[in-house]
Each structure stands twice: as C-alpha cells, then as structure tokens.
Regions:
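Terminal targeting signals and extreme-terminal segments of soluble enzymes
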Residues: 1-155
Length: 155
C-alpha cells in the first residue's frame, strides 16, 4: 500500500528531497516538507513540516519524542549552518528539550527557529515544534563548527 504524501500538506510547503546515501536516518523518519521564509534580518529561515503518521508514534499513539527531537535538531543545524556566509558545517554539541504537548496522528507539525548567538567556534539557537499555534516541543541547541572541532581534537 502506498501513501499519497501530497494530500493535506499546507500551502507553500514542498517535499524535501533527501539524499538516500547521506540522509538515510531522516529519509526513514520522513517524508519531510519545507518552505523558505524571509526573516527581518535579511536571512531566510527554512521551516520544516511533517504530517504525523502511525509510523511516527510511540506505544501511546502520540508522536515519538525521539522523532520530534530529531526534527528539532535537523531544523536547528540546517538553519544555523546557513545563517553565515559562507555556510558552515556544524555538528550538535548539546540539546535540551521540553515536551509541552504530544502531536497525534494526522497533526501537521512545523518548526519555528530563533538564533541566540553565533560565535567563531560555537553557535546557539532555539527551535519550537508547533501544531497550529500550540507549542509541542521547545529545544535549545549548541553547535560547533566542524573544522573547529577537528582542530581541537588534533591539539
């Protein structure tokens, strides 16, 4: 049985084509959608979205927390890496998440991203996952620049 993922996707969102070679984990969790939204500071935020399916749920029938954290981590890393020119390769150093509510099957979940600080070696940001205007998950993340990480490991 195939699922038509184009049904019930909010206007403006398009399917996020993932590389099966390099993004197998996210491919397994998808399908992911996105839209690019201009910000006040002249950057573009990529808002990610997903329709919760039964495969995304835990034993209680709500969205699995690990899947939600993966979504927040991906949105944080993607948007932070592209907030500088040129874009930087970043890896997660720390995530802290608060579960506020539980998305259910057929809920549409979107990311909302905010930069806290961008430094030479570390960057900090926050991401909320929302169903409509209701916050489901609040995550703060710390990321390091990949070439800086290699430099520290080699010292």
């Amino acid at each position: 049985m195939t699922t038509n993922h184009s049904l019930d996707i909010p206007e403006g969102f398009i399917l996020h084509e993932l590389s099966p070679q390099s993004e197998q984990f996210l491919t397994m969790l998808g399908p992911w959608y996105y839209k690019n939204v201009p910000t006040d500071n002249g950057h573009v935020e990529r808002v990610f979205g997903i329709r919760i399916e039964p495969k995304h749920t835990n034993i209680w029938g709500t969205a699995h927390g690990g899947m939600l954290i993966s979504m927040a981590d991906s949105a944080l890393g993607y948007n932070l890496s592209r907030s500088t020119e040129p874009p930087q390769k970043l890896v997660t150093v720390h995530l802290s998440s608060d579960f506020m509510a539980s998305p259910k099957p057929n809920d549409w979940v979107e990311t909302e991203f905010r930069i806290s600080k961008i430094g030479k070696r570390m960057s900090f940001a926050e991401c909320s996952l929302k169903v409509g205007n209701k916050i489901m998950l609040r995550t703060s993340g710390v990321f390091t620049v990949l070439n800086q990480l290699k430099k520290v490991q080699n010292d």
